């Protein structure tokens, strides 16, 4: 007789964990140990559920690499005892966290599903129940006793995405996330339809490796008409700065002004890693397609291809934390490690 999957619910904070005090109207933190009382539907799921919470749940605006390590360590310590993990997280930075965890959890052979909500769990119109119930169902999916999904995902409003391909696109709608450059992994309707051919392949029998060193000496710089030499020079000169995500126009284009190219050339020669990521919501960087990007290619700017900004900055933190040799850094960044780029 096949045993039920064991699922660990990890509550970090966020709107999903709030409940409205109907007397005062104030949102207050919800005790997740009493989860079954508030969502009795969970009793009908074909899995065993346990919960764990941050000692001090946080608003996702306060998430940082130290908190990512905390999530990773919870998964690491519980990995042998559970078949899947659901991380409850505020939606504002969920794509950053899902991207970071995808790089930190090497050889992952179990599902880690991030989810949250736009309305609190106690609100009459909440999207929290559907997101939570379906995320748990997805984490429980098995074939012949093995997990169907073995990567870090994000589930929101009927759709499951690869975590490091997502970005938040709306502050108010329930359909708050998108995966512009990679199809959805699954969709929930009358049936739960999984696109198995799109899921990352199982990592054979390799042991889970949890990478906990992330280097935060990085920055995101967005190109805009009027960016000036004084400001960019000041940014490049920040002490201990090791990498920049440069959000460029279109397919990787930027101003061809001599001062701009010279600043970047000097920075790259000094060891600074500069990654070219499009500021468009979809599409890919293709340096050399236009004159306005050919100079960037010549001076050694790294192509982010079709990576999201969220995945780019967390991948940069991860690779810097691994002390990747400068000679191979560009090659490794331009290589897909966890399905984050084409």
Locations of the language-model features?
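Short glycine/serine/threonine-rich phosphate/pyrophosphate-binding segments
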Residues: 18-19, 93-98, 131-132, 253-255
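Short Gly/Thr/Asp-enriched flexible loops that form oxyanion-binding sites at enzyme active sites
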Residues: 88-110, 256-263, 292
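Buried hydrophobic positions in well-ordered alpha/beta secondary-structure cores of metabolic enzymes
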Residues: 13-14, 86, 135, 158, ...
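Internal gly/pro-rich beta-alpha loop/helix module
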Residues: 114-189
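C-terminal non-catalytic interaction/assembly regions of soluble proteins
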Residues: 251-342
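Short, ordered loop/turn segments at secondary-structure junctions
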Residues: 12-14, 90-91, 117-120, 249-250, ...
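ATP/NTP phosphate-donor binding region
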Residues: 1-77
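Accessory alpha-helical/coil subdomains and C-terminal extensions
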Residues: 4, 10-14, 32-43, 162-251, ...
């Amino acid at each position: 007789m096949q045993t039920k999957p064991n699922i660990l619910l990890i509550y970090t904070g966020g709107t999903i964990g709030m409940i409205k005090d109907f007397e005062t109207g104030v949102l207050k933190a919800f005790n997740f140990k009493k989860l079954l009382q508030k969502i009795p539907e969970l009793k009908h799921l074909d899995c065993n559920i346990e919960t764990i919470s941050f000692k001090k749940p946080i608003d996702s605006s306060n998430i940082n690499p130290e908190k990512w390590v905390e999530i990773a360590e919870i998964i690491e310590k519980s990995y042998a005892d559970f078949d899947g993990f659901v991380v409850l997280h505020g939606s504002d930075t969920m794509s950053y966290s899902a991207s970071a965890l995808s790089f930190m959890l090497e050889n992952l052979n179990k599902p880690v599903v991030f989810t949250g909500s736009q309305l609190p769990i106690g609100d009459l119109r909440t999207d929290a129940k559907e997101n939570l119930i379906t995320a748990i169902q997805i984490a429980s999916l098995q074939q012949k006793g093995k997990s169907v999904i073995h990567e870090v995902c994000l589930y929101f409003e009927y759709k499951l995405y690869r975590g490091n391909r997502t970005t938040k696109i709306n502050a108010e709608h329930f359909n708050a996330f998108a995966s512009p450059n990679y199809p959805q992994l699954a969709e929930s309707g009358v049936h739960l339809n999984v696109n198995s051919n799109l899921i990352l392949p199982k990592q054979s029998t390799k042991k889970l490796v949890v990478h906990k060193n992330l280097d935060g000496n990085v920055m995101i710089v967005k190109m805009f008409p009027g960016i000036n030499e004084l400001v960019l020079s000041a940014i490049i000169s920040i002490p201990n700065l090791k990498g920049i995500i440069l959000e460029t126009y279109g397919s990787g284009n930027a101003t061809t002004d001599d001062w701009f190219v010279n600043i970047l050339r000097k920075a790259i020669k000094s060891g600074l890693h500069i990654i070219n990521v499009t500021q468009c919501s979809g599409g890919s960087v293709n340096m050399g397609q236009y004159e306005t990007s050919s100079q960037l290619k010549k001076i050694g700017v790294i192509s982010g291809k079709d990576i999201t900004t969220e995945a780019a900055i967390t991948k940069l933190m991860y690779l810097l934390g691994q002390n990747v040799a400068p000679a191979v850094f560009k090659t490794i960044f331009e290589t897909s490690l966890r399905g984050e780029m084409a």
